Amino acid sequence: MKELIQSLLEQTLESLKAQGIVPADFEARIQVDRTKDKSHGDLATNLAMMLTKVAGKPPREMAQLIIDNLPASAQVAKVEIAGPGFINFFIDDNALANQLKAALGDAMLGVKAAAPQTVVVDYSSPNLAKEMHVGHLRSTIIGDSVVRALEFLGHKVIRQNHVGDWGTQFGMLLAYMEELRAQGDDKANLELSDLESFYRAAKLRFDESDEFATRARQLVVELQSGDAYCNKLWREFNDISLSHCHDVYARLGVSLTRKDVHGESAYNADLAQVVADLDAKGLLAISDGAKVVFQEEFRNKDGEPLPVIIQKADGGFLYATTDLAAMRYRSGVLNADRVLYFVDLRQALHFQQVFSLARTAGFVRDNMTLEHMGFGTMNGEDGRPFKTRSGGVVKLVDLLDEAVERAEQLVRSKNPDMDETEVKEIARVVGIASVKYADLSKNRSSDYIFSFEQMLSFEGNTAPYLLYAYTRVAGIFKKAENIDLTNAELVLDHDKEKELGNKLAQFGEILARMVDKGQPHILCGYLYELAGAFSSFYEACPVLSADSETARDSRLLLSRLTADTLKQGLSLLGIETLERM
């Protein structure tokens, strides 16, 4: 309905231009919003106030002119002027009911496909030298939910797992791997099964043994020069590390696969050319032996230009160089319209600098957007970054294990007679869903406090609450499996039916906002409100015991669309649903 009102207003604006009331060259971004108070209609616009100055008319007079020129639509029951010049639209109940009925027979649930774009999404991107930890959670699940929603809306999405698979630390790891292999493959494989311990042991050898450190540095040089033996060792290590990552992805229900891996090493051959091209454009300067770029718009607190370091004095390249090569690849080869980077907010300045430099250097097309979708920190209940009791980094797999264990205790306490297999399956779904939803339901730009107690609660905006809400709606159909709804009509007579219907009709708008802003909490908030609207409807409007078959069948249709929307919405967040809890 929002798109309909927008279209009617666009036609009206053209009519006002044709009549000379509004200048022909005037461009307006017409905004239509949902009203909070339904006594003021369903949708509202401030277009009259936008046109007041250019048309030279008072806002309310301008609003009346808009209404007088508005094309007639059977889907609009009435239009009113409110306050200083807002225009309120009341949607016809039958039109809304017909829209909802059509959504029931549609795989997209009535959501219109967007004008398709090619969207590259850079997310997760762990460092392969170490095991995935809680710091990787936000990028991985926020990026994945936005990817799912983009694909649902019809966009071509290219996932890019920009893993850290290159650098001097790999010399140390390969030297240790080589040392263990000399003692037998079994020992090497055993130690590699715990990457965190492997990394610590390698670092200890590097710090304590000059001979080992020399060998590690030698391996870095050989690896970078393309030595076949080193390359083989490096590939073996990365393969093992990626297996660890994909085990975690599988548990999280994340859609990344091996073919989405396009790590730092993929750009090695392009880095020298990036430097040469920046030099050819006169952008490079030398600072303390390093090749850097100074950009006037980026200065420190003393007003001095901040450099982007492109190549160190020893010839080594940096993240900025690799990111520039990646941007050029994503523009020229992948032909992206949008590139979204789900990376920690603390990297904001880095991305501002490299985005600006990529444009100045002509590495990306003018019509391609570069968007840093930064996120805050996941903190413990002490308000500090989440750590183990001893102050160490929490492995992501350990966090998931604890969530599932706690969920299992919860399920057992509520269902002491439940079958063991079912308990474990429900616990798995609830545990993983709770971790994901606790994160996704927060504004990604904010830090948040991680609390097992809060995330496993059945009250408030949590995964258990929504999963239970879905099972409650789906449960109605177990009792109504013999009722034929083929010819049922959907009618909205009760206020609570209309409220639920209006909420269901917003699904497409919500998804469009979510992918535009890269903010999954928008969808989470909507699903929570939808579950609340259904609860209010269910209390006020008996379904199976309705006064008539017509009312019963209509309410069953509303319930079916609610269940489908909850399930689809949770699926777009990467969350499985349950038929019973």
Curated annotation (Swiss-Prot):
HAMAP family the record matches: Arg_tRNA_synth
Kindly provide the name given to this protein in its UniProt entry: Arginine--tRNA ligase
User: Subunit comment for this entry?
Assistant: Monomer.
Lineage per the UniProt record = Bacteria, Pseudomonadati, Pseudomonadota, Gammaproteobacteria, Alteromonadales
* CC per GO annotation: cytoplasm
Designated gene of the protein: argS
Q: What Pfam families does the record point to?
A: Arg_tRNA_synt_N, DALR_1, tRNA-synt_1d
Q: Which InterPro entries match?
A: aa-tRNA-synth_I_CS, Arg-tRNA-ligase, Arg-tRNA-synth_N, Arg-tRNA-synth_N_sf, ArgRS_core, DALR_anticod-bd, Rossmann-like_a/b/a_fold, tRNAsynth_Ia_anticodon-bd
Task: Name the Enzyme Commission number(s) assigned to this protein.
Answer: 6.1.1.19
